[in-house]
């Protein structure tokens, strides 16, 4: 997927044999991704 810094984009994470939608925000200051919220019972990374 394309990394868009400063913008929020949807990321589909495959976990527990099920597909959950997660909203991920790219933060270029910390050079990482900040998890906003998970739509589903997804265990923490």
UniProtKB/Swiss-Prot annotation:
Upper lineage: Eukaryota, Viridiplantae, Streptophyta, Embryophyta, Tracheophyta
Organism expressing this protein natively: Dioscoreophyllum cumminsii
Assembly and oligomerization: Heterodimer of an A chain and a B chain.
UniProt keyword annotation of Cell cycle present: no
UniProt keyword annotations, A-Z: Taste-modifying protein
Statement on biotechnological application from the UniProt entry: Natural monellin has not been mass marketed to the food industry, primarily due to the challenge of large-scale purification of the protein which is relatively sensitive to heat or acid treatment.
Physiological role: Taste-modifying protein; intensely sweet-tasting protein.
SUPFAM superfamilies from the UniProt entry: Cystatin/monellin (SSF54403)
Pfam families referenced in this protein's UniProt entry, alphabetically: Monellin (PF09200)
Superkingdom to which the source organism belongs: Eukaryota
Protein name as catalogued: Monellin chain A
């Amino acid at each position: 997927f394309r990394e868009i810094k400063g913008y929020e984009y949807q990321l589909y994470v495959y976990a527990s044999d099920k597909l959950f939608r997660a909203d991920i925000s790219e933060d270029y200051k910390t050079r990482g991704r900040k998890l906003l919220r998970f739509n589903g019972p997804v265990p923490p990374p």
